[in-house]
């Protein structure tokens, strides 16, 4: 599937340092040991609603990873999926009286426009679940053959399930206890009470055909994929084993990332699906959790329609650390707009303070678990000195503007 147009990433002098990120499985910040080509799989949207700031914050975090890898001299193979066959999509389409495919296509296009406006680098492979049915079927067949999966004893709906105990390491990614797993499994799309399952935590791999639902033929009967297996199949088919980063929002730690990793591991025999499991925090609005039920979603497209500069949206989200749950507010946006104006004024000056030190510090801060708050403060200090008339380096304003563009994805004027 087509993604969106890529913004140009300008080159900076020298190379950035090795990236260090917090790994949810190991619960510590450690180096990301990528090869010449760094690989990353980030879970994409379920296209039944517009992109809100929680989505945007997640994709901005991994956009920074992408940019820092490029700055460190890596090629990047980035894969993102689209969960375009799932219950929330069908439910919203039925509510609105629209075909689920048309709803998905509309929201995917809006997502593309939002990502392009925010200057997010597109994935190398942008894959809809409906375009990966063959890969899913192949993976489920392998799990059935190995005993990692089974068909429930239900003549009407013979669904295929994954055995949660199929790998001895199951649970390592989330580090959650059994009770927490069960709670989150029920809250986040699981079906612990499904009759015929061997264990409450066993996860759906293939949902047998139901009336009114799309389905595809398979050796184990017509149906459609479960959620977690889609990502395992797409990642394995596009990247293979030895994935550097599996990423997404913190709400995907369990069950989604735990199971997608386990599905892949049960087939490949690898101990770890990914070397790093990286998760972004949640975004709330004005002191409350952002949710559809509250009706307080802040949509990127709505902000753009109101005339908000996408670079200000980007700076507002980057003002907080990516792993922290944090709140968006009018004050956050106002502060970001003020910061953007100051940066643009400073980098438009004919001269400024030498940029060597600020470039080195910004690179160092970002490479240390994407510490954007420190990076932004370092840039603020340079801009303040420049606006106060300090420095006589004629190349510095352009160097700083180029660094902000290349590393943070924020476009500033460069003469």
Curated annotation (Swiss-Prot):
Motif 'KMSKS' region, residue range(s) on this chain: 289-293
Motif ('HIGH' region): 45-55
Binding site for L-cysteinyl-5'-AMP: 43-46, 58, 81-83, 227, 249-251, 283
Cofactor note: Binds 1 zinc ion per subunit.
Cofactors required: Zn(2+)
Motif ('ERGGDP' region): 187-192
Positions contributing to Zn(2+) binding: 43, 231, 256
GO terms for biological process, alphabetical: cysteinyl-tRNA aminoacylation; mycothiol biosynthetic process
Keyword Zinc: yes
GO CC annotations, alphabetized: cytosol
Keywords: ATP-binding, Ligase, Metal-binding, Nucleotide-binding, Zinc
Keyword Zinc: yes
Classification via InterPro entries: Cys-tRNA/MSH_ligase, Mycothiol_ligase_MshC, Rossmann-like_a/b/a_fold, tRNA-synt_1_cat_dom
Role played: Catalyzes the ATP-dependent condensation of GlcN-Ins and L-cysteine to form L-Cys-GlcN-Ins.
PANTHER family the UniProt entry points to: CYSTEINE--TRNA LIGASE, CYTOPLASMIC, CYSTEINYL-TRNA SYNTHETASE
NCBIfam families: mycothiol_MshC
Subunit annotation: Monomer.
Protein name per its UniProtKB record: L-cysteine:1D-myo-inositol 2-amino-2-deoxy-alpha-D-glucopyranoside ligase
Species whose genome carries this gene: Mycobacterium sp. (strain KMS)
Gene name, Swiss-Prot/TrEMBL: mshC
């Amino acid at each position: 599937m087509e993604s969106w147009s890529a913004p140009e990433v300008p080159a900076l002098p020298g190379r950035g340092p090795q990236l260090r990120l917090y790994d949810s499985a190991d619960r510590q910040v450690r180096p990301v040991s990528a090869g010449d080509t760094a690989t990353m799989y980030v879970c994409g949207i379920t296209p039944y609603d517009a992109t809100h700031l929680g989505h945007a914050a997640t994709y901005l975090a991994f956009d920074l990873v992408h940019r820092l890898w490029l700055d460190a001299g890596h090629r990047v193979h980035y894969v993102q999926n689209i969960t375009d066959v799932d219950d929330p999509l069908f439910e919203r389409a039925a509510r609105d009286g629209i075909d689920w495919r048309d709803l998905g296509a509309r929201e995917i296009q809006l997502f593309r426009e939002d990502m392009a406006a925010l200057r997010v680098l597109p994935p190398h492979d942008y894959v809809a679940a409906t375009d990966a049915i063959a890969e899913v079927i192949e993976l489920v067949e392998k799990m059935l053959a190995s005993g990692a999966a089974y068909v429930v004893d239900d003549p009407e709906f013979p669904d295929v399930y994954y055995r949660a105990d199929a790998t001895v390491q199951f649970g390592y990614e989330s580090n959650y206890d059994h009770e927490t797993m069960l709670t989150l499994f029920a809250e986040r799309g699981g079906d612990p009470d499904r009759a015929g399952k061997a264990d409450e935590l066993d996860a759906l791999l293939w949902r047998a055909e139901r009336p009114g639902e799309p389905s595809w033929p398979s050796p184990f009967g017509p149906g459609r994929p479960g959620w977690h297996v889609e990502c395992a199949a797409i990642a394995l088919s596009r990247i293979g084993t030895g994935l550097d980063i599996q990423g997404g929002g913190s709400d995907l730690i369990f069950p989604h990332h735990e199971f997608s990793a386990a599905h892949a591991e049960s087939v490949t025999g690898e101990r770890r699906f990914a070397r790093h499991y990286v998760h972004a925090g949640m975004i709330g609005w004005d002191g409350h959790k952002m949710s559809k039920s509250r009706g307080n979603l802040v949509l990127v497209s709505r902000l753009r329609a109101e005339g908000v500069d996408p670079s200000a949206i980007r700076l507002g989200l980057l003002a907080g650390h990516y792993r922290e749950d944090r709140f968006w507010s009018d004050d956050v946006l106002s502060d970001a707009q003020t910061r953007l104006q100051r940066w643009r004024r400073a980098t438009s000056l004919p001269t400024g303070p030498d940029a060597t030190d600020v470039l080195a510090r910004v690179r160092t801060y970002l490479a240390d678990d994407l510490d954007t708050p420190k990076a932004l403060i370092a840039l603020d200090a340079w801009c303040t000195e420049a606006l106060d008339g300090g420095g006589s380096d004629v190349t510095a304003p352009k160097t700083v503007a180029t660094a902000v563009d290349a590393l943070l994805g924020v476009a500033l004027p460069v003469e």
